[in-house]
Amino acid sequence: MKIVQILIAVTLTLSFCGKVNAQGDDADNHYKGLFANRFDSLGQWSVHYQFTSVLQGHPAFNSKYSGKNSLRDTAEKALSVTATLFLGRKLWKGAAVFVNPEIAGGKGMSYALGLAGAANGETFRIGSPEPALYLARAFFEQNITIRKSKTLYRKEDQNQIADNLPSSRITITIGKFSLADFFDDNSYSHDPRSEFMNWSLMDNGAWDYPANTRGYTWGAVIELIEPSYCFRLSSVLVPKIANSQIFDLNIAKANGETAEFEKKFMINDHPGNLRFLAFTNFSSAPSYNTAISNMRHGDSSLVAVFSGQKAGVQYGGLKYGFGISFNQELKSYLGVFSRLGWNDGNTATWAFTEIDRTASLGIRVRPNIIKRPGDNLGLAVVVNGISNAHRTYLNSNGYGFLLGDGKLSNYGYEQIIEAFYKIKLISWLWITADYQFIINPGYNKDRGSVNVFSIRLHVEL
């Protein structure tokens, strides 16, 4: 039954994407378990589907000037669509393989340019809005028992096979995936399909996590998982060109490493998590100071490297940084979260977004008081900044792959407030109203403020 519903959903997605191109508790468990009961009685498979569409826009705002990478100061709107099929198959004890074909279409406002904290986490800086089919994930997972420990049942879910797993184990993942699948997994602010939409709220903005334009990479992750803590380490490919689909296969000189320690705890019988993240990226990314010096002598050739137009001329680029993520349940219906992030800000942003320092704080609420426990309310504030070298580069008529107003003589922290209300219409369908207020877009006090309004439709099967 469920496989039929998913096929129908995929068909509807293809139809919907065509339109995008033309525009430039018990009941839940019963429903989601139909496929497992009728098709997969042994629990060998996992099949899920998601569809997300975001309609977003902003009215005109004050701007003293604009550059080629500026957020448009006239009113605009944009529509994005993604659809993902999550396929998983159990292989042997503790092992499984997962494949996720995905379709993405539409675009972000101003093609996702002009904001360090871009307003729609479902969009990427891609030149064409036409729907495209691609392989998002394809990875192998092996769980290894490391000592006698309690066995825990893990329910079947997206990219997750129903299985009994030891509470103390090592998990090895190899293949294509998003590093955000494993790291910085804040319980209240991580998924732009169902939570906050802003880029700097879905992940730690100062973590320039290695990925292609759509957010995926190839590599390996190893996790030590214990009941009260976890340790993760990854090594993956980095792009050959900033924010591109092409990976650099010279892995001796171009690679990205991320490490994270996660501590789990209880406060007054309510769960919480604290995560410490560190990363290093090696690539052909040039330094801001080198580009600034060259531009003062009339050589602006490195701007094409920073803006993702061509590959770097030599290896040796190093970016490193740190992040802290915290989330704590206060009541069964209320939770708080926070993030802090910093990177050295000396070399070009190569994969995620042009943020060198970030701090965020927010809350999530299930409004039981109005007897709608399936709904969700979120409110958060995030402040983003860049290094002095990054600031000087942008003020010298430099451009990154996201930012560049032509100058930046009046620098200010980019400040974002986001609020959303998510309504559960039926067991598999949600609609969200979202508002973002953005001060100093792209760190520029001469532009803004910007009001962003969004409607999001989300399906999960």
Where do the PLM segments sit?
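Transmembrane beta-barrel strands of outer-membrane/channel proteins
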Residues: 47, 51-57, 99-103, 172-176, ...
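Outer membrane beta-barrel transmembrane domains
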Residues: 260-262, 277, 281-316, 337, ...
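Surface-exposed strand-loop-strand hairpins of Gram-negative outer-membrane beta-barrel proteins
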Residues: 57-80, 186-189, 446
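Surface-exposed coil loops of outer-membrane beta-barrel proteins
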Residues: 114-130, 150-256, 260, 398-405
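Outer-membrane beta-barrel "beta-signal"
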Residues: 136-149, 379, 449-461
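Short loop/turn motifs that connect adjacent beta-strands in outer-membrane beta-barrel proteins
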Residues: 35-47, 59-60, 89, 93-97, ...
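Hydrophobic, lipid-facing positions within transmembrane beta-strands of outer-membrane proteins
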Residues: 45, 79-85, 134-140, 170, ...
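Residue-level signature of outer-membrane beta-barrel architecture
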Residues: 53, 89-90, 101, 142-144, ...
